[in-house]
Amino acid sequence: AEPLFRSSCLIADELAEECDFFSIGTNDLTQYTCALDRQNAKLEPFFNPHHPAVLRAIKMTIEAGHRHGIWVGICGELGADTALTETFLRMGVDELSMNAKSILPVRKIIRSVDLSKPSEK
């Protein structure tokens, strides 16, 4: 399943009982969580994929998926967002989907993170 709406994140436990995996669609999740039209250039300054509500929805979904033993991935622009790579690793995400040009920068961060130590952020 691809949780795109805040409502699907809120019932992720129930959805996880019926699914083999979650692939969190971060572009739409951000749009719907922030109640914005991505096609409206005037609203672009308010489109914030780092908003605490978006990150909390992602974390809730990852935790629910893992409680039910299913794989959880991130797809959309946030998979390549190096500012969030460590955050997603600490949340327990199983996979980050991204375009080819983003693989090396993200891989560099993944290799540098020591999950046994507290976050420096």
Task: Give short role names for the model-derived ranges.
Residues 1, 5-121:
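Conserved alpha/beta-domain cores
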